[in-house]
């Protein structure tokens, strides 16, 4: 009988500790959810502006046959597109970014081959694909073009 009473006391204490731990854990979960809800998340336009910069830098790198820099800029564009798909899932536009893949692959192929003529034509294809994507998501007023001047004066593209 003493063993039975000891077991009841033991389980009673253990259950109370478990309930106390559950309350503490729930409080921590609630706190983390609140912090997460107020964490900064870049907007779709910020991602697009980032791509615009790398698109321009890609052009000047390729025009100057700086294939290493062009390759770097391609990776930056790809990373930003991946971030759009990860952080902007609620946006309808996010579902369309994969339409850029064939033109990105064409530019990448030109870079790997170090072929200026192929780079020029594939870059134009990429630019037109950007505009087609903009039209597909009702942002056709946002027209991308081949840049005329480098986006930054403090970077060498040669």
Predicted features, each with a name:
Residues 144-154:
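Short cysteine/histidine-rich metal-coordination sites, predominantly Zn2+-binding motifs
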Residues 80-97:
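Short, solvent-exposed, charged loop/turn and helix-capping segments
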